[in-house]
Amino acid sequence: MTFTASSSSCAITESPVVVALDYHERDKALAFVDKIDPRDCRLKVGKEMFTLFGPQLVRDLQQRGFDVFLDLKFHDIPNTTARAVAAAADLGVWMVNVHASGGARMMAAARDALAPFGKDAPLLIAVTVLTSMETSDLHDLGVTLSPAEHAERLARLTQQCGLDGVVCSAQEAVRFKQVFGAAFKLVTPGIRPAGSEAGDQRRIMTPEQALSAGVDYMVIGRPVTQSVDPAQTLKDINASLKREA
């Protein structure tokens, strides 16, 4: 497994690391970002920060040289989802996601909405099973499959709809690469360097384990954002991944 770059011709970094920004204050988020190098990672903006600070936060990060994964997990009727995905592309994000459970028509509409953007379109991925969910959580929703089985079913639907890949747990990555092929991108949260606390994630792996499993992009949050020296932490993670590769 080697580092994979964005499909965009203007890729900033070849690191597979995506740092999750989870801040309540814009100034603190930007102060953290100013400590790290866009050559060492990409950045993920989720629902809370986007709701608080809007598209301008994404522009602020882009102006600092970072690729941005807009993690809003769109899940709505096909037309609404398509418009939202197109708006994300207009914003110039590197990656955007939808919920695979929204179904084939919704995912196909999202895919088609990106066609006018050509090579400048963001990667479009789908969320399968949230990494916080266990078998009992799925059973509560009437799903009798295990998280791995349900994730694979949704991943297959995602590929059939022509999306670029899925969000999945690292434990599913090995099989997904075998089943769906190397070109189908796997984005994995719940990645934590050895010695880090699990937090609210239930299915976790170290960066080295994730790379070996076939993960293309690994989302890492607090182990980097709460580090006393986040720039060095990122360099250490990337160095360990290069050794693993």
Curated annotation (Swiss-Prot):
Active site: 73
Pathway entry: Pyrimidine metabolism; UMP biosynthesis via de novo pathway; UMP from orotate: step 2/2
Broad enzyme group: lyase
Binding site residues for substrate: 22, 44, 71-80, 131, 192, 201, 221-222
E.C. code: 4.1.1.23
Reaction(s) this enzyme catalyzes, per UniProt: orotidine 5'-phosphate + H(+) = UMP + CO2
GO molecular function, one term: orotidine-5'-phosphate decarboxylase activity
NCBIfam families according to UniProt: PRK00230.1, pyrF
Subunit note: Homodimer.
Similarity comment text for this entry: Belongs to the OMP decarboxylase family. Type 1 subfamily.
Protein name in UniProt: Orotidine 5'-phosphate decarboxylase
